[in-house]
Swiss-Prot record:
This is D-specific alpha-keto acid dehydrogenase. The gene is vanH. It comes from Enterococcus faecium. It comes from the Bacteria. GO terms for biological process: cell wall organization; response to antibiotic. Its EC number is 1.1.1.272, 1.1.1.345, 1.1.1.28.
Amino acid sequence: MNNIGITVYGCEQDEADAFHALSPRFGVMATIINANVSESNAKSAPFNQCISVGHKSEISASILLALKRAGVKYISTRSIGCNHIDTTAAKRMGITVDNVAYSPDSVADYTMMLILMAVRNVKSIVRSVEKHDFRLDSDRGKVLSDMTVGVVGTGQIGKAVIERLRGFGCKVLAYSRSRSIEVNYVPFDELLQNSDIVTLHVPLNTDTHYIISHEQIQRMKQGAFLINTGRGPLVDTYELVKALENGKLGGAALDVLEGEEEFFYSDCTQKPIDNQFLLKLQRMPNVIITPHTAYYTEQALRDTVEKTIKNCLDFERRQEHE
């Protein structure tokens, strides 16, 4: 096979460096575009059938049409989720969309960190210490081994989280459409009713949008914690804020947030933030917010770039044999 070309959109410098380092090993010519893909830059690298996009790129039907006209037949998204792409329109136009299933360890480790930070009141402790207030908080932390953790979704990341939870000696409940590991699977309502901590690891689609809303929160244990390292719209933020304000939930740790594209990955130090939900959550001592960074490790970067290249090569090989 001759060298193939891949157009890489929405590429940060560390990703660009990794593509430049790895592409020659696979006989690939990578064209790096810093901007997210759009109708105006769809022709930035003509004759490339394959493109790569990041999860920050919202790819609508009109952008897909521009890509199709530019000769694009394949999109590899540098993410596990594909909810930022109109996959229905892509299928209609004959454009194949694939995700990149990078190592789950980065997100699983981060999830465990958030769980521990939530149950040990780390945000309040750090805030007090930064003000030179070294008194012990009146709200004592909890021991994970005494708690029941409900894991929603047992794909690669959910399984990795369960493996880590077992080391802490806590009881684990799981809910998933497919039962892929040895764990105590229970109906979703039963998981909510019996878990001290609920952690979300399902993809975002029409079935999982607002999988946690008013009814689900009311079924959760009084004082339970909610952890989300999946996708923001898995949780109805309005209902979450209400439950935190009235004390129904004991706390939350969120690496993703509904509407995060307004502010995550941007320097907002010199401009006001209008998202009232974010501002309310940030003010709460029992809520941890981080900017969709659970995946952000050197290992995940290497995995993502290498698997993106391999995805594109596999597609090109299939095209040759058709």
